[in-house]
């Protein structure tokens, strides 16, 4: 159907500078499969702002920061479509996909690259629950761990990760 929740966090040097979280009224019924996966019900989004109303505050919160996500292109495709429908410019921020990075750095340790599998295996502080902010915080934990692991490839921070072959991305 459409976006039902937005979550974001800003980090600098591993420190969380702030978070943004809101339910979003998708303007249509929520399929039962989404409710089973996320726990989000129609009553939870009743009265919530539309994505059209949320986009300006999300864009302001994000600014020109690098966007990090697990399968980030999937999430960005929803935001890009929402921006198009709202008559807004799409996000043009650089992006890093922790799924692609995990495949490269953890490929021999894990049966798959699902965020939940990785979070359990690595005992991340935050566990993903298919809820926006939980997944954001788990992804941030994963990124920080992967930055440490990427040191063997000569990367010492996010800017270096963007320069690694097959790690750089643009929405």
Descriptions of predicted regions:
Residues 126-145:
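A charged, well-structured terminal subsegment
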Residues 89-103:
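Conserved beta-strand -> loop -> alpha-helix junction used to position metal-binding or nucleic-acid-contacting
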Residues 54, 102, 138-139:
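Short Asp/Glu-rich motifs
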Residues 1-93, 108-130:
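Conserved non-catalytic scaffold segment of RNase H-like nuclease domains
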Residues 121, 140-171:
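Acidic two-metal-ion nuclease catalytic site recognized across multiple nuclease folds
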Residues 14, 25, 101-104, 164-167:
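Short, solvent-exposed coil/turn elements at secondary-structure transition points
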């Amino acid at each position: 159907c459409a976006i039902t929740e937005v979550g974001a966090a800003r980090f600098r040097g591993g420190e969380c500078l702030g978070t943004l979280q809101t339910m979003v009224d998708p303007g249509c019924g929520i399929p039962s499969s989404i409710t089973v996966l996320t726990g989000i019900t129609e009553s939870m989004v009743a009265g919530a702002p539309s994505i059209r109303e949320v986009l300006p505050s999300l864009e302001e919160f994000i600014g020109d920061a690098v966007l990090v996500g697990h399968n980030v292109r999937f999430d960005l495709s929803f935001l890009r479509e929402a921006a198009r429908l709202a008559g807004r410019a799409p996000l043009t921020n650089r992006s890093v996909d922790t799924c692609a990075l995990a495949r490269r750095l953890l490929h021999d340790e894990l049966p798959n690259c699902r965020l939940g599998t990785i979070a359990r295996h690595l005992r991340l502080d935050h566990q993903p629950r298919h809820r926006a902010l939980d997944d954001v915080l788990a992804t941030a934990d994963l990124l920080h761990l992967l930055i440490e692991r990427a040191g063997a490839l000569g990367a010492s921070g996010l800017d270096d990760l963007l320069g690694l072959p097959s790690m750089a991305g643009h929405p």
